[in-house]
């Protein structure tokens, strides 16, 4: 028991010493913020009204080990469009959305594939913003379910400094940390595919119930990447997505 208690203390001290938010702004945090600002000022080529909403994830966001450079080689930034949203299949569309979403939002249902964690996104609703008694809400219009429209992404490097890295588009930079840019679709609900995670048995009572509740309330994201058995398939490679819990 004493040995187990010692291990518990070592793990706890490591997490407390390395996984808190940085108390001071570092050069790497500034570079991450710079990448976020650059992505946020861009607009999708097929939708000038849409905004990219950035979120820094990965080691730069999670650790404050200094110096950071030996441990981190790039900045991971996820971006989702302000005009797109994913919801679990069978869930009703939301009537209210966070302020960063646009006046119109396309809502895609998350449909399971044959591989756990990998899904398809099927266009289901169009939400349009309206004001009722001073309250901003969204009116819902349903698409024809007889003609399924699958959301697809064809990610191609835009320059010699870019390459595909899993679900990310890797941008090499010789002066700053390189950028791993992961386009995604925001899901405000916790997906039923991970329904057992909040009640899963946890050693050492970590994460605690408050942290679990906070993670679940943040929902998840859906990133464009196909299962390894489907990446050579012309259809599946473009239409298959994967659930991501990086914002946790």
Language-model-derived ranges and their functions:
Residues 1-248:
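Non-catalytic helical "accessory" subdomain of NTase-fold nucleotidyltransferases
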């Amino acid at each position: 028991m004493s040995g187990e208690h010692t291990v518990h203390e070592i793990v706890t001290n490591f997490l407390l010493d390395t996984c808190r938010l940085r108390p001071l702004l570092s050069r790497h945090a500034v570079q991450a913020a710079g990448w976020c600002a650059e992505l946020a000022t861009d607009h999708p080529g097929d939708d000038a009204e849409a905004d990219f909403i950035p979120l820094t994830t990965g080691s730069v966001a999670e650790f404050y080990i200094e110096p950071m450079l030996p441990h981190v080689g790039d900045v991971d930034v996820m971006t989702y469009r302000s005009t797109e949203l994913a919801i679990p299949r069978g869930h009703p569309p939301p009537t209210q959305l966070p302020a960063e979403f646009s006046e119109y939002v396309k809502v895609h249902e998350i449909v399971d594939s044959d591989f756990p964690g990998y899904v398809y996104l099927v266009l289901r609703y169009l939400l349009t913003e309206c004001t009722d008694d001073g309250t901003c809400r969204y009116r819902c219009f349903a698409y024809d379910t007889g003609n399924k429209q699958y959301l697809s992404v064809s990610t191609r490097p835009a320059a010699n400094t870019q390459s595909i890295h899993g679900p990310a588009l890797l941008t090499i930079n010789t002066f700053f940390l390189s950028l791993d840019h992961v386009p995604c679709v925001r899901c405000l609900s916790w997906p039923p595919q991970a329904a057992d995670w909040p009640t899963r048995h946890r050693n050492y009572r970590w994460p605690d119930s408050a942290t679990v509740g906070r993670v679940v309330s943040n929902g998840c994201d859906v990133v464009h990447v196909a299962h390894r058995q489907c990446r050579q398939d012309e259809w599946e490679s473009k239409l298959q997505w994967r659930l991501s819990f990086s914002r946790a």
